[in-house]
A protein has these predicted regions:
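The right-handed parallel beta-helix/beta-solenoid scaffold, focusing on the short coil/turn
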Residues: 1, 6, 10, 17-19, ...
Length: 153
């Protein structure tokens, strides 16, 4: 399914399908189920999206505020905007990979994997320990009161 303009209804659900959003808008409460692939290069998917055992690739446009993943879902962000205020809640078994774009908020519970590729990472204004040369990686645990900032690759 290709969406390049106009408005798709709220509550739209896809199962095991590929959807490409290059313009226009998909209303709130969008659901991608069981092996679906959602490719967003422009346009937007409204708030409260629910991604279940599926993949979202965001390289442009906007992906819904207050959205969540369940099961073995994967979120790949190389551009665009993820969330506005409440961002994304990554459920157990989920994976998120960030190499670009803007991430407003991310909640990642136990059993999740988050990879952020870039440089100049600071945690509450201090350099992240262990990131001294290109290719270094570090496991970082921080609270909701702390900010992680950096330049995404």
């Amino acid at each position: 399914m290709n969406i390049s303009g106009g408005l798709a209804r709220s509550g739209m659900e896809v199962r095991g399908a590929t959807i490409a959003v290059s313009g226009g808008s998909v209303g709130g409460d969008f659901v991608a189920l069981f092996g679906s692939e959602v490719n967003i290069t422009g346009g937007q998917i409204g708030p409260f999206a629910n991604i279940i055992d599926s993949v979202v690739n965001l390289s442009g446009g906007r992906f819904g505020d207050a959205s969540q993943t369940t099961g073995n879902s994967v979120i790949n962000v190389s551009g665009g905007v993820l969330g506005d205020v409440f961002g994304l809640s990554l459920g157990s078994g989920g994976e998120a990979n960030f190499s670009g774009g803007i991430i407003h908020d991310l909640s990642a519970g136990s059993g999740t994997s988050v990879t952020i590729t870039g440089g100049e990472f600071l945690l509450d204004g201090q350099p992240v320990v262990g990131l001294n040369t290109p290719g270094d990686s570090a496991a970082v645990n921080f609270s909701v009161a702390e900010d992680l900032v950096g330049v995404l690759a």
